[in-house]
């Protein structure tokens, strides 16, 4: 078995990506480039001569539109090459591997992808560096060395999960230092509670995995701890809206008395859910499905199916991906819609419609006006739109409402909201409690380095250096795999076997 490097470039009449990039660089960086070429690079491993020929002709290129070569003349040319960071999910490479395996029967084939950018009309080294800074987002990619020997090293040394010896005896000062050293999102009070539990109940020190899981699922991203902040001493400033705000607040206080007799603390979460709880108490939400599964809002509806009325479940879910989209727009926006789909999908429903609402600052401002430590607003706006569109197109989901709001406040952080609706026949769903001996299935794509710590990363305060230090906290979307799960769950024989199902997102640990 051998290894090969294949270069694939669009013929001039089809080189829309290269022409678009040339226009983009000239307009936004005030350059005078005369031409740009973009060449996809495939490093293919563990194949023989016949298999690489099959891959070149049938997988890596299209005969009508592409030029394929095993070498690339870069003599005297100004260029740079890029590739994904090690461990990042590379959908182009993954798709190539699957196709080559299907065509050749070779299960050992491996592929890495990259891209070469050739620039004509560069006046200085300063311009090259300017282009690299604009094009390369260090969160997801790096420069590729075309002179380095081909290598594909998937070997990972699996170490024993460490136990934090002495943890249950740490002082408050040591616990606080521990939080900072391990980059955790939880508070000192959180970790003190964990320490007390392990000291009194488990009578042992915790492992790294146990603390990481708790840090993830206790994070603001997962548990919305910000909305549980206690609200005290509420007053309203005098002004145009004083009376209506005061009246609304008093109505809320009366609802609290009617619903739970003020036994629960006043929080933003209580404000957000109190109306629904009152409606349910009054018997106005009898169509709401209530279960132990916390996936998506689910209500019972009657559906006319070929003239006969059938009970179905209609599910709604929305998700924000503000932080991920701010630092890696394409991946953040694509996994926003992907994550929103995953929740009603976990409820066994088929998601058939979506909407996207986003918020950005002035997308017309120049690159030079970009705040330090942030991506240009136009980059965030364009690439996030591409990410949402890419994921939706691949999974086959129509997005029937799209709106981007522009306000200077979104310069602090981009807003990315995805919302979906799905449905499933009620008789194809069962909600039961798991029991000892039940089979547990973990279903989905392979986990890469991307996305690890995503939930806790979204829950921490961010600084000017966040874009350099959060390199693994934005997951790469894998729409084809989620589409396979969607198709599997459309089979009632499958869903009727499932007692309980929950989305296992938030990036992993």
Model feature map: region roles:
Residues 1-462, 467-481, 488-496:
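Core nucleic-acid recognition elements
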Residues 486-509:
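Functional cores that coordinate and move charged inorganic groups
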């Amino acid at each position: 078995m051998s290894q090969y490097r294949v270069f694939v470039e669009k013929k001039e009449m089809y080189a829309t990506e290269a022409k678009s990039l040339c226009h983009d660089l000239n307009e936004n960086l005030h350059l005078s480039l005369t031409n740009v070429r973009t060449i996809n690079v495939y490093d293919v491993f563990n194949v023989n001569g016949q298999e690489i020929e099959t891959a070149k002709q049938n997988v890596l290129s299209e005969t009508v539109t592409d030029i394929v070569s095993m070498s690339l003349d870069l003599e005297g040319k100004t260029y740079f090459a890029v590739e994904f960071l090690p461990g990042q999910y590379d959908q182009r490479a993954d798709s190539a591997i699957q196709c080559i395996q299907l065509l050749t029967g070779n299960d050992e084939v491996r592929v890495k992808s990259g891209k070469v950018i050739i620039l004509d009309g560069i006046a200085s080294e300063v311009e090259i560096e300017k282009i690299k800074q604009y094009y390369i987002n260090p969160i997801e990619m790096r420069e590729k060395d075309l002179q380095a020997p081909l290598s594909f090293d998937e070997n990972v040394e699996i170490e024993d999960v460490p136990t934090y010896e002495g943890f249950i005896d740490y002082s408050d000062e040591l616990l606080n230092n521990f939080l900072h050293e391990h980059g955790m999102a939880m508070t000192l009070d959180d970790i003190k509670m964990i320490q007390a539990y392990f000291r009194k109940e488990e009578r042992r020190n915790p492992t790294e995995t146990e603390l990481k899981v708790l840090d993830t699922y206790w994070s603001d991203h997962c548990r919305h701890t910000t909305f549980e902040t206690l609200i005290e001493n509420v007053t309203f400033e005098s002004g145009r809206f004083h009376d209506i705000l005061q009246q609304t607040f008093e109505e809320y206080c009366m609802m609290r008395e009617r619903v739970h007799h003020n036994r629960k603390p006043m929080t933003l979460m209580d404000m957000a859910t109190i109306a629904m709880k009152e409606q349910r108490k009054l018997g106005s939400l009898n169509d709401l499905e209530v279960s132990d599964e916390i996936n998506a809002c689910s209500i019972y509806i009657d559906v006319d199916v070929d003239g006969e009325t059938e009970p179905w479940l209609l599910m709604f879910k929305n998700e924000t991906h503000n932080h991920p989209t701010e630092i890696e727009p394409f991946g953040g926006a694509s996994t926003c819609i992907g994550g929103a789909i995953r929740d009603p999908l976990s409820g066994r429903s088929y998601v058939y419609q979506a909407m996207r609402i986003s918020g950005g600052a002035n997308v017309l401002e120049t690159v030079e006006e970009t705040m330090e430590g942030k991506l240009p607003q136009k980059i965030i706006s364009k690439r996030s739109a591409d990410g949402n569109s890419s994921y939706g197109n691949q999974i086959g989901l129509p997005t029937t409402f799209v709106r981007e709001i522009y306000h200077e406040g979104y310069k602090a952080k981009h807003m990315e909201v995805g919302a979906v609706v799905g449905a499933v026949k009620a008789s194809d769903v069962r909600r039961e409690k798991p029991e000892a001996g039940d089979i547990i299935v973990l279903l989905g794509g392979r986990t890469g380095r991307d996305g690890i710590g995503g939930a806790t990363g979204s829950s921490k305060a961010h600084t000017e250096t966040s874009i350099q230090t959060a390199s693994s906290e934005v997951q790469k979307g894998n729409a084809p795999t989620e589409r396979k799960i969607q198709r599997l769950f459309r089979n009632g024989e499958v869903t009727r076997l499932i007692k309980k199902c929950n989305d296992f997102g938030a990036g992993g640990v």
